[in-house]
Amino acid sequence: MSTLGSFIWSIADQLRGPYRPNQYGNVILPFTILRRLDCILEPDRETVRDLAAAYENPNRLRIQVKKATGRPFYNTSKYSFANLLKDADGLEDNLVDYVDRFSPDVDVFEYFDFKKEIIALEKAGLLREIVKSFGAVDLHPDVVSNADMGDAFEYIIRKFNEAANETSGDHYTPRDAIRLLVDLLFAEKDADLTEAGIVRTLYDPTAGTGGMLALAEEHLLAQNPDARLSLYGQEYNPQSYAICKSDLLAKGHDASNIAFGNTLTDDAFKGRQFDFCMSNPPYGVDWKQYAKAVTKERDEAGPYGRFAPGLPATSDGQMLFLLHLAHKMRAPEDGGGRAGIVMNGSPLFNGAAESGPSNIRRWLLESDLVEAIVALPTNMFFNTGIATYIWILDNNKHPDRKGLVQLIDGTSFWTKMRKNLGSKGREISDTDRAQILRLYADFTDADPDFSKVLRNDEFGYWTITVERPLLDECGKPVVDRKAKPKPDSKKRDTENVPFTYGGSTAGPAGKAEVIQSYFDTEVKPHVPDAWIDWAKVKTGYEIPFTRHFYKYVPPRPLAEIDADLDKQVAKILDLLREVEG
């Protein structure tokens, strides 16, 4: 996957003994970042030291450094990898001084608790060798591109997570999946993105190490070198946050746009909206510890709050991020926004009518926010083989797509990898990606075997409660004081009635007529004494993705099966004769 990543990880062999394998990343990751920044800063080190001597005010210094070097960050220490080893006795103190003298926006090493690791390495007698090993690797962007550096981080993090046996729900997003998501996200806006000097904002509330942000920028600049994409993100894992922030720093972005913290309980960009939003939240990871704060926000924010439509079960927080993204899209009156999110299959169908998940789907569909859902191949992620889906949201749809949702079955568009990377044995090649994008672009003209376009109301249904009378010992209905038959709770049943039953296109407005028609046709002929409890009718929405792409495979003819059985029986009899003979 990454020759550089493999080489850097091999440095961890020096840590054997004092460190366990699941602790290697605590050393390797911050040293990799430090060396990358060290190489970037090297050409202007003397200039920055002179400026630091002339300007004591940090804000003035930052402005002058930006003017002189073009970079928003700097380091004023007299030490670097070039001279750290010259003072063997002072290595620990000098390295700490070097880390301490980065500009205030370079706070990434605090999130690794890096000083503690420096002290531990010195005590173990390993610090000199580690510094020497990293000093021998040139990580300057002219030598190692941002893409290659991203691959190296991806490799190191995967090795670290394998050793640490990280939570299965926390998945590093492979680059082939990100590229597809980015292409789909920008697909409807490609014409706009070629305008001269455009400025667009992109936001990832689960930024991880910044892979999505980096590839989105790469995509935009490939289309329009003069475009400027302002990147924003938030990340709760300290190490991932540090990597993401340092990567953006290295590229010259405003590091203050990357925030540390829990997006669900403390939105660092509250009140902000963005042109493009994207996320790959953890799958099936519970949010019980945040439930109190999330519920409080839902109750206090009112009907327009981000969690107002509903809350999913505390066992899986994916749909909270889905709601969050929907509220982060730029308002339609300001040009609208688009969002892309990768999730597993649960958000498509989990939860009964009027449950939290169903109400979230209802809000998204009745608000006409869901533009497309793409099923990805299985075995796409490094530590899980589960089925995953890309949801594309748009609050300002193209007129042809209004009121419609496109489902794309991309499960067969994959290429086998030469070598598995954990659970990842498949990748979406450029050709595979182009085929999926063609299906998206063709829309209603796309191959129906792989693409379906449905009205929003086709995902809706009503759950009706069907009652039957309670009978006395003589078999007669028991009635209440108003002479109405009492229901028998043991015979109570429920039925799901699609909005579209009987060819209805009225959607929610057809409730009474469609339900009555369904009841008269599907229920009454079988249980003539039944009735509907109209007070218990519930509205639900689900997206039965696989059902829409189900292909009936008829069973083999009986004669063919019998012939096969006869052949097998004959073989067994021949073997028995050989044994007896």
Q: PLM ranges: what are they?
A:
Residues 14, 23-36, 181, 241, ...:
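Conserved Class I SAM-dependent methyltransferase catalytic core
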Residues 168-279, 283-296, 319, 344-346, ...:
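Conserved S-adenosyl-L-methionine
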Residues 1-190, 257-268, 375-378, 402-409, ...:
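Non-catalytic, mostly N-terminal accessory regions of nucleic-acid modification and defense proteins
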Residues 214, 242, 279-281, 319-323, ...:
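Feature representing long, continuous alpha-helical segments
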Residues 131-132, 161, 254-258, 299-305, ...:
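Short acidic (Asp/Glu) and glycine-rich catalytic loops that position anionic groups and cofactors
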Residues 286, 290-315:
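Conserved catalytic motifs of ABC-family nucleotide-binding domains
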Residues 290, 382-472:
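Flexible, glycine-/basic-rich loop-and-beta segments that form/coincide
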Residues 273-274, 316-318, 334-344, 370-371, ...:
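Active-site lining segments that contact anionic ligands and/or coordinate catalytic metals
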